Amino acid sequence: ESCTGGLIAATVTDIAGSSAWFDRGFIVYTPESKMELLGVQPETLNRCGVVSEPVAREMAVGALAHSNATIAVAVTGVAGPAGGTEKTPVGTVCFGFAVKTPQAVCAESSEQHFVGNRCQVREEAVKFSLKTLIALLS
């Protein structure tokens, strides 16, 4: 998690019994932490920008590589109120989803644009993450 700052992990661990299926979370707020903890490639960050689908995919794949999980979600975005650009305005959030099978790791990504203040953008990012995870598990 980047712009959500651990809110996804906090939300799922609010559920009693979540220790049976939740392994760990990574808060990687800076580009350096994304590289150090999740193995995001510097070239990807330089070429695509920190808020991008390729970075989100690499984050999700890295989360699987550094955990016992079989499914991972990654979030990187601009929650606001500052920090937006013309290319990535406030409310832009990129998601990476990775699933580990015995044969391979499959990853996909999505870019969403949420409207609202910082708290609302983060909450919408959590909702989108969890809805997508549920769909992937169904």
Tell me the role of every PLM-derived stretch:
Residues S2-S138:
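Short alpha-helical segments enriched in small residues
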